[in-house]
């Protein structure tokens, strides 16, 4: 009888130990998922600031320096599943002087019989060149709405930072590719029109 009780106690201890380990593993797994979701916006901000991962830079002023050296810029266009748009660059490539401000255009057409809404993501290849690819104006800064059958021209104003010539990892780069992908989004919610209350006399 004593041996049986001892075995039962050992079994209960083993079960409690297994339950503790399982709970610890589950907690770790949940924490890792939470950390992964939290890291997405932080990673996006990091990429936008540093150009890491081919994320281009947004600027509000033009380059003061234009070099004699030129570089070829190619343009790529894609649409994700669920967005019936014909989206493409007007020009497939241009050759520009480094530091020179250039405007090119994409065009999009809604092939659906209802209004559709899209948001563009973008990147540059090679990835390291994203830190030197500066966009002054871009349709990707805002969401886009296309009515049924509507065509829209979408300008992009950019320049390649002259500092790119001082980057030893990019000294042999002759071509940069700017790529956009449009994703479907839900219809934007209307902004509530709140009327300001005017005070009445005596209030």
UniProtKB/Swiss-Prot annotation:
Annotated Gene3D superfamilies: Ctag/Cox11
Biological process terms in GO annotation: respiratory chain complex IV assembly
Keyword field: Cell inner membrane, Cell membrane, Copper, Membrane, Signal-anchor, Transmembrane, Transmembrane helix
Topological domains annotated Periplasmic: 40-203
Residue ranges annotated as Cytoplasmic topological domain: 1-16
InterPro entries linked to this entry: CtaG/Cox11_dom_sf, Cyt_c_oxidase_assmbl_CtaG
Transmembrane residue ranges: 17-39
The keyword NADP is annotated on this UniProt entry: no
PANTHER family: CYTOCHROME C OXIDASE ASSEMBLY PROTEIN COX11, MITOCHONDRIAL-RELATED, CYTOCHROME C OXIDASE ASSEMBLY PROTEIN COX11-RELATED
Protein's name in the database: Cytochrome c oxidase assembly protein CtaG
Organism: Brucella anthropi (strain ATCC 49188 / DSM 6882 / CCUG 24695 / JCM 21032 / LMG 3331 / NBRC 15819 / NCTC 12168 / Alc 37)
């Amino acid at each position: 009888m004593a041996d049986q009780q001892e075995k039962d106690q050992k079994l209960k201890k083993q079960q409690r130990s297994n339950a503790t380990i399982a709970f610890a593993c589950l907690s770790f797994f949940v924490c890792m998922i939470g950390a992964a979701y939290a890291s997405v916006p932080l990673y996006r901000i990091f990429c936008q600031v540093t150009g890491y991962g081919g994320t281009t830079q947004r600027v509000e002023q033009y380059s003061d320096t234009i070099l004699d050296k030129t570089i070829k810029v190619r343009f790529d266009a894609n649409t994700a599943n669920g967005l019936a748009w014909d989206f493409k660059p007007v020009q497939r490539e241009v050759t520009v002087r480094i530091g020179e401000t250039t405007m090119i255009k994409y065009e999009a057409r809604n092939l659906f019989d209802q209004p559709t809404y899209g948001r563009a993501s973008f990147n540059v290849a090679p990835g390291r060149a994203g830190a030197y690819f500066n966009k002054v104006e871009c349709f990707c800064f805002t969401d886009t709405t296309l009515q049924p059958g509507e065509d829209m021209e979408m300008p992009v104003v950019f320049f390649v930072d002259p500092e790119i010539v001082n980057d030893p990892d990019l000294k042999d780069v002759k071509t940069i590719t700017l790529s956009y992908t449009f994703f479907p989004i839900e219809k934007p919610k209307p902004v509530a029109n709140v009327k300001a209350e005017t005070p009445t006399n005596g209030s």
